[in-house]
Amino acid sequence: HQYLPEKISGISIATQGIISPDGTAVTYGNIMGNTKMQLSDFSSRLPYPCHLEHDSKAAADLELWNHPQFDSALIFLLNQNLGGAMITGHSVHQGDHMRSGLFEHICIDPDGPACYCGNRGCLETYCSANALKVAAGMPVSEFFNILHNTQTPTLSQIWQNYLDHLAFAIRNLNLVIDCPVIISGYLAPYFMESDLLYLLNKINEHSLFQMTRDQLSVGEHGQYTPAIGASLHYVKQFLNLTK
């Protein structure tokens, strides 16, 4: 597509990695090896204003845009690598060092699989799309095609294990922030109603406080959620919605 330069407000970049509070650099980017990557690496080469954003926070921006009724929410970004974000007070919670919502590094089992962060048993090693791919021994799309169209006990058990670990994390985090949960990212389109009901049952199974079905939502934009969410930075500027 050819767009007139005056029609382009800027370029917003959603990247894996924790962004500095001033938005000028990546302070931790072990997955992509982009630690210390600078916003100026892009802005110096592109003829438009540039904005850098953590992909999980960008995803949360989009989910908040799509769910304006939510004052607070927990976002699980089920991409190739797991991501998380928190919405509080109708905005994405950043934290003092931009590290709020890193659900992927909650320890599920201290003796579990090695995580890229150097620890073991992080939620990343159980609930990322990559972890599901490794457990299934096949691409994610193929896994769900077989799972949804055939009776394959082995694959059903793999998916059940995945949902069990996700439910464990949701149940514990929901005690910290009493709010709705949004399943977002690459794996979200594969979730069926039966999966959500199973997940809800596992969340409530050992919980004193019960979550209801209306508190569990699925995002609509799949793997493109962070990219669309990042673009909202300039959309909000155009609409004069930035604080």
Features from the language model and the residues they span:
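Small-residue faces within membrane-embedded alpha-helices
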Residues: A14, N79-N81, G229
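Glycine-rich phosphate-binding loop and adjoining helix at the ATP-binding site
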Residues: H1, P5-S72, S194-E205
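Generic structural "secondary-structure junction" signal
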Residues: S20-P21, Y28, G33, H105-I108, ...
